[in-house]
Amino acid sequence: MAKDKIVLAYSGGLDTSIILKWLQTERNYDVVCFTADLGQGDEVEEARVKALNTGAVAAYALDLREEFVRDYVFPMFRSSALYEGYYLLGTSIARPLIAKKMVEIAQKEGAVAVSHGATGKGNDQVRFEMTAYALQPDIVTVAPWRDWEFQGRADLEAFAHEHGIPVPTTKKDPWSTDANMLHISYEGGILEDPWAEPPAHMFKLTVAPEEAPDEAEYVEIEFLNGDAVAINGETLSPAALLDRANEIGGRHGVGRVDLVENRFVGMKSRGVYETPGGTLLYHARRAVESLTLDREVLHQRDALGPKYAELVYNGFWFAPEREALQVYMDHVAKAVTGTARLKLYKGNCIVAGRKAERSLYDKDLVSFEAGGDYNQHDAGAFIKLNALRMRVQARVEAKAGQKDKAGD
């Protein structure tokens, strides 16, 4: 009798290799492995080969770099989303794409279930499984970290030795990482102490600001209908543009963030992030928006941005409310066409200029010189009308105070 198939999100590391074998031996599945190339390096094809050598009945390695930036990162950027004011959501935005491809492979392979290596304490389990259920409501999800009996690293390594899975002999970094084209995240281990400064050798995308060049670099980023399309006059594809921005920002130490964030599952965690290219694009886009977006539209968009960020962070990318918000964000972004000039210096990303053909900025209006459509005499009536409610309240309070004194 044929076994049921399950699709595993496979990284090639020790943990997902153990999961692969555990799904075979303990759950009696034929395992189909899937590795997504989101720009994390050369190990994608190596992971595919390792999956087959470890016992997978099939293994996929898909280059998703352009799709990731075009259909996930850039739409998210249109909302100017920052989770809790700092985090550019590099891990969060990658999970729905990975889970979507898992479901598509499951449908192609006739698999009944999907599996992942996320722990039972983190956000990724939610992101993977929420996406899977949204796209295939009857899919079975298997989360080994929530199900198996292993009590610690020693048990995992014993299982690996029993089943011929190589266990690295080199000392592991005392933190975990997740990398893609948008960022690298670091958490756990020595970083669990929120007072401990991350070691200098941990960072991979950015130089230390104090070791960055002593001379500032200027970079121009051009936007068309809300998306970055060119750097320093060179038109690039979404993925190539983000790569270029990462390279430029990284050599100046731009884009490091260290924060304690609130996980969806209820606990606080400390995360350290490198997002050099995303940081450049964020500040450049805000600069162009300052010229091209109406005040009330900009303020309304910014009021909705934190909610959008929360939905992405919590795993609701395919939820109807996120999709509805996206329609609004895309409509607003149509006006964002122009160029920003940034000055990069020792970890700082400073807006040094912005221009747009359809700019709402009118130099004549803001000039201190006489003339133009703005009559300064009108300001008095404007102020008085806007102060009306406060004047009424002050009179009421003054009258009430007089009564209180009379009562004394």
From Swiss-Prot:
Alphabetical GO biological process terms:
argininosuccinate metabolic process; L-arginine biosynthetic process; urea cycle
Where found? Cytoplasm
Q: Which domain of life is it from?
A: Bacteria
Sites binding L-aspartate sit at: T119, N123, D124
> What does the record give as EC number?
6.3.4.5
What cellular component GO annotations does this protein have? cytoplasm
**Family matches, as Pfam families:** Arginosuc_syn_C, Arginosuc_synth
Residues bound to ATP:
A9, Y10, S11, G12, G13, L14, D15, T16, S17, A36, G117
SUPFAM superfamilies according to UniProt: Adenine nucleotide alpha hydrolases-like (SSF52402), Argininosuccinate synthetase, C-terminal domain (SSF69864)
Q: Which residues bind L-citrulline?
A: Y87, S92, N123, R127, S176, S185, E261, Y273
Q: Which family does it belong to?
A: Belongs to the argininosuccinate synthase family. Type 1 subfamily.
Q: Report the protein name in the record.
A: Argininosuccinate synthase
What species is this protein from? Deinococcus deserti (strain DSM 17065 / CIP 109153 / LMG 22923 / VCD115)
